[in-house]
Amino acid sequence: MKTVLIGVGQAGGKLASALQSFDRQTGFGAVLDAVAVNTAKADLQSLPVETVLIGQDRVNGHGVGGDNELGAAVMESDQTEVMSALDGRVTAEAESIFVVAGLGGGSGSGGAPVLAKALAGVYDVPVYVLGILPGADEGALYQVNAGRSLKTVAREADAVLLVDNDAFRSAGESMSEGYDAINEAIARRVGLLLAAGEATEGVGESVVDTSEVINTLRSGGIAALGYASAEASPNAEDNINAVMSTTRRAVLTGTSLPDASDADAALVVIAGEPDTIPRKGVERARRWVEDETGSMQVRGGDFPLESGRLASLVLLGGVERSERVESFMERAREAIDKAETEPREDPKGMWHSDDLDDLL
């Protein structure tokens, strides 16, 4: 899937940069371009992508201090500047646009829904949001921001591919080390998904293409992405169990949103050398995902890739009923209840409701 990435806020800019870097290192060619947008000048300076500083008349390059209503207002007033930066970048070759944002910070949580809506009104391709949930220990402000942003962005984007920070954090890591590891892990997963049907080595029996990714996300709402890999045997028949076990791990323990196996649709992609991918294994994995998700809309296919390993990539669409999403929204509601002041109303009405019930 050919795409253009737009990172919003500090976390969004870093992850968009990591995705572009992964795509270039692998030679997939799925990421056509990447742009980072932020209200904090310092957070843009080290990024290896085109950058756009917004809100200079309001915050003078110092960021919005976690205020997502200010982040939304700044994006609303400066969106023309952002859209101008995309001229010549979102070409006819683009099959999608990904807005990448941390949903806990002010610029990302406030700006991403505004930008997604603006992009959808201009471009005739799906606009997805790759959103990062804050960890449970990241403070009440981040929980409130993310809860409101998730509810709003799910309405404005064609789908929200959600990443839970807590699913990737390892014990003993510093905060910066943890975020770097999360970015690398997500870049690998999303990079492989975007590359499906693009830069392939050899010819698979049933190669996944962009339309299958789009159809899996067509129902909208929240999506999750699972991944697992294992050593491959040279003989395809010997890899049936490997395909099954990696698919189970991808769904049960390797998703970007844990406990999200109840889905409206799914796509199972088995990546590896074409001669090592067992057709029976792919079909069995697809049927297992059908049973696990309760969905009859489960697609499956190959991603021919020069590698000594087999990987299972499972895209789950329509997972907003998952336990993890429900527990996060409850956490956000509790944070709102503890807030000492009522949030201000944003001038454009994007943040019209403090009620976090009924996500969609």
From Swiss-Prot:
- Briefly state the protein's biological role: Involved in cell shape control.
Quote the protein name from its UniProt record: Tubulin-like protein CetZ2
Which stretches does the entry tag as region Disordered? 334-360
InterPro entries assigned: CetZ, CetZ_C, FtsZ/CetZ, Tubulin/FtsZ-like_C, Tubulin/FtsZ_GTPase_sf, Tubulin_FtsZ_GTPase
Q: Which Pfam families match?
A: CetZ_C (PF21011), Tubulin (PF00091)
Can you supply a Gene Ontology BP term from the record? cell division
> Source species, please?
Haloferax volcanii (strain ATCC 29605 / DSM 3757 / JCM 8879 / NBRC 14742 / NCIMB 2012 / VKM B-1768 / DS2) (Halobacterium volcanii)
GO molecular function term, any single one: GTPase activity
Any idea what a deletion of this gene does? Does not affect motility. No differences in growth rate or cell size.
Alphabetical keyword list: Cell shape, Cytoplasm, GTP-binding, Nucleotide-binding
Gene3D superfamilies, sorted? Tubulin/FtsZ, C-terminal domain, Tubulin/FtsZ, GTPase domain
GO CC terms in record: cell division site; cytoplasm
Question: Which annotated residues bind GTP?
Answer: 10-14, 65-66, 106-108, 138, 165, 183
Effect of mutating residue 212 to A: Reduces motility. Produces a high-curvature phenotype
Q: Where is the composition biased (Basic and acidic residues)?
A: 334-354
Q: Where in the cell is it found?
A: Cytoplasm
**Entry's PANTHER family?**
CELL DIVISION PROTEIN FTSZ-RELATED, TUBULIN-LIKE PROTEIN CETZ
Which family is this protein grouped under? Belongs to the CetZ family.
Judging by the UniProt lineage, the source's domain of life is: Archaea
